Design a protein with these regions (language model features):
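Non-catalytic accessory segments of hydrolases
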Residues: 2, 8-192
Length: 192
């Protein structure tokens, strides 16, 4: 009788732990509200981002290359097409194809299940708060910190790191990005 009670309690604890991690580890998908003070001009077009809780400015999901699909699948990245109007850079882009895991976009019950999208070559930017007229120029420009996510070239994504605190506290521009993973990013063959 006591053995059954102990086993039941252990089973309940195990189920609770799995459910807890399933809920806690799933990234929150959030679309932020664009703020016109963050509007900037890039080589590909105009973008507008948002203001983080700590006051830093952020831009999510800015394309840095064309989608590596079709004829571009096994090629070096190509510059993105210019866009018309203003790109609302307020949402993290899809992650690159990978199997679900701790650094992917799925919870623990989805480990080893495929996730992601080949149209994933986007970057995220955080900067201290500057109005358009007060952006540092020339020798006053801020340093840039590129954050390359880990994951053994098989898992991970640029959205796994939030650069808002670093940007605001240390007056630095923080950039994270997605890059092709696994065989879509690291496959080598003479025919390619």
């Amino acid at each position: 009788m006591i053995k059954k009670i102990i086993l039941s309690i252990l089973l309940i604890i195990c189920i609770a732990v799995v459910l807890f991690y399933q809920i806690k580890l799933k990234p929150k998908h959030h679309v932020y509200k664009p703020d016109s003070i963050t509007e900037r001009v890039t080589q590909s077009g105009r973008v507008v981002g948002f203001i983080e809780d700590n006051g830093s400015h952020a831009w999510f999901g800015i394309p840095y290359a064309k989608a590596p699909v079709g004829e571009l699948r096994w090629k070096a990245p190509r510059a993105p097409d210019k866009w018309e109007g203003i790109l609302e850079a307020v949402e993290l882009s899809p992650i690159c194809p990978q199997y679900g895991g701790m650094m992917g976009d799925m919870g623990p019950l989805d480990y080893n299940k495929p996730c992601g999208d080949e149209d994933c070559l986007y970057l995220n930017i955080w900067s201290p708060a500057f109005s358009r007229d007060a952006i540092p120029q020339g020798k006053d420009r801020l340093p840039v910190r590129w954050w390359i996510h880990g994951g053994g070239n098989s898992i991970g994504h640029g959205g796994s790191y939030n650069g808002r605190v670093l940007a605001e506290m240390y007056d630095v521009i923080v950039i994270t990005f997605n890059y092709r993973l696994g065989p879509l990013g690291w496959f080598s063959h003479p025919a390619l």
